C-alpha cells in the first residue's frame, strides 16, 4: 500500500488541499481510488495513452458550447473578425495548436522530458493556480526550444 507511487500521490493530494486546487485534488483522488480498488493495471495504460486526447476533446466540447447554444453565431463571428484582437487571438490559436502538435509527439516518445513537464505542470497547478493543459503546450514549447538549440549547435 505504501509504495513510492502511493506516497507521491498522497503528497500531491496534500499539495492540492493546501493550494485549494480542485482539479489536482480531483485528479489525484481518482487515481488513488483506481489504485485502491485494484483497477490500476487495467485502467492506467488506457488513461496514460488516451487521456490527453480525451482531455483535449472535453476542452473542445466546452469551448463549442456557446456555438451549440446559439450564443455565438455567424453574426458574432463576423463582428469579432473586424477586431484586431480577434485576429491576434486567431493567430495565437493557430500557433498554440501547431506548437502543441509537436509536443504531443515529444510526450509520447521521451519519458525523461515527460517527467520534467509533468512536475512543472503539477507545481504550476498546485502553487500558482495554473491549468493542467501545461504538459501538452509545455512539451510543444520544449520541442520548439530543442529545435532552436539544435539549429545553433549542429
UniProtKB/Swiss-Prot annotation:
It is found in: Cell membrane. The chain crosses the membrane at residues 8-28, 54-74, 87-107, 117-137. Keywords: Cell membrane, Membrane, Transmembrane, Transmembrane helix. It is a multi-pass membrane protein. The gene is ytwI. This is UPF0756 membrane protein YtwI. One of its GO terms (cellular component) is plasma membrane. It comes from Bacillus subtilis (strain 168). Belongs to the UPF0756 family. The keyword Lipid biosynthesis does not apply. Its main location: membrane. Pfam families: DUF441.
